Amino acid sequence: MTGRGRLDLKKRHGLQGLLALAIVLLTAFLAAPQAWADEAAPINHWNVDVNLSLDGVAHVNAELEMDFSKTVGRGPVFVLPTRQPGGEDGQFYRYEISGIHVSSPTAPAQTHTTTDKEGNIQVRVGDANRYLHDKHTYRISYTVTGLIAPNHPKSHLDEFNWNVIGNWRGRINNLTVKVTGPEDVSKAACWTGNNYKQSCTSSNSGK
């Protein structure tokens, strides 16, 4: 990724007054929860709920169940990217993440947050001295500013273009993503796999 330009979209781009909004969901690139183990524990379900406010801020709430009876670990490591490709001439869209909160009804949920050299925010969840051997549910919430790409160079629409889960090394048995907001959606699309070559089911309502 070095050597490419960066398109700074840190300023908020609101939804109010948009003629059309395209929602594009990607499920492989940078954002990747991993377990504290060589191989990630499989995920039984992963549900993501995103609410877009009028000022273009995305409020993310996600719940996932990890099965540590299959692969022992200490908890997930959420890797939240602060940039992704999509601009003109190889440029990156950049955005800000804030208000990260993680909880679990059954497992240790203390967090240790760092930022790597690529700018990804890494949130390590769990107790370093406790290994898990059962199924455990985790909930993570955070706010993303700058995900609305105005007049995207390819679609010429205002896009909510987001990598939902990233390069997750373990098995995900069920994944759902719901995006809601105050404006109509013109188009919706979803891709998964390496290089986003495999389409996944998507639908939209409101226009």
Where are the regions a protein language model picked out?
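Bacterial N-terminal signal peptides that target proteins for export
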Residues: 4-21
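Lumenal/extracellular ectodomains and adaptor appendage modules
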Residues: 32-207
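Residue-level marker of intrinsically disordered, low-complexity segments enriched
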Residues: 7, 21-23, 41, 46
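Bacterial N-terminal signal peptides
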Residues: 19-31
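Charged, low-complexity surface segments at secondary-structure and domain boundaries
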Residues: 5, 25, 81-85
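Terminal, compositionally biased non-globular sequences in eukaryotic proteins
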Residues: 2-3, 8, 33-37
